[in-house]
């Protein structure tokens, strides 16, 4: 006979499932938890767990609305150090792209615009979590990239 799973197992599995960022409804989460062996789970309990852990719905990489946890989301707060809001910095021959926590791109872009041309930044365009940086000169894009990375203590 199989031992029943503990509440700690449920919490661990619940968090693991939300990290997958592919569940857009509570019923999908119920089904996934039942598949993991939690037969006594229902929509009401999932709803309470979502509230308890502060889960929110946001868009994943495929632009689907899914549930995720705040720790995975990295929601900016007034006390968030700016370096914690920058998730990735990359570039090609013409542009630098900065990925941020959801909702942080406008704040980071405003900072980048304020340092501007002296640091090699002609301008920025920001969405919710992505910033396109147009360098003053594509010939010095590596220098501008390093400036942006050092500004946020970002290391590859």
Swiss-Prot record:
Family under the similarity heading: Belongs to the ArgR family.
Keywords: Amino-acid biosynthesis, Arginine biosynthesis, Cytoplasm, DNA-binding, Repressor, Transcription, Transcription regulation
HAMAP family reported for this sequence: Arg_repressor (MF_00173)
High-level lineage: Bacteria, Pseudomonadati, Pseudomonadota, Gammaproteobacteria, Alteromonadales
Protein name: Arginine repressor
Functional description taken from the UniProt entry: Regulates arginine biosynthesis genes.
Top-level taxon in the UniProt lineage: Bacteria
Protein location: Cytoplasm
Protein's pathway: Amino-acid biosynthesis; L-arginine biosynthesis [regulation]
Gene (name only): argR
Gene Ontology MF terms: arginine binding; DNA binding; DNA-binding transcription factor activity
Record-linked InterPro entries: Arg_repress (IPR001669), Arg_repress_C (IPR020899), Arg_repress_C_sf (IPR036251), Arg_repress_DNA-bd (IPR020900), WH-like_DNA-bd_sf (IPR036388), WH_DNA-bd_sf (IPR036390)
One annotated GO biological process: protein complex oligomerization
One GO cellular component, as annotated: cytoplasm
């Amino acid at each position: 006979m199989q031992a029943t799973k503990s509440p700690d197992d449920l919490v661990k599995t619940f968090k693991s499932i939300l990290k997958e960022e592919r569940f857009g409804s509570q019923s999908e989460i119920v089904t996934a938890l039942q598949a993991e062996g939690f037969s006594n789970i229902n929509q009401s309990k999932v709803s309470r767990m979502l509230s308890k852990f502060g889960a929110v719905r946001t868009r994943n990489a495929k632009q689907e609305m899914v549930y995720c946890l705040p720790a995975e989301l990295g929601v900016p707060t007034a006390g968030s150090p700016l370096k914690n809001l920058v998730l990735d910095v990359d570039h090609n021959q013409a542009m630098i792209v900065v990925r941020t926590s959801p909702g942080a791109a406008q704040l980071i872009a405003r900072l980048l615009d304020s340092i501007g041309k002296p640091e090699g930044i002609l301008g920025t365009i920001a969405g919710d979590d992505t910033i396109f940086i147009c360098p003053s000169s594509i010939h010095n894009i590596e220098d501008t990239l390093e400036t942006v990375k050092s500004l946020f203590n970002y290391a590859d």
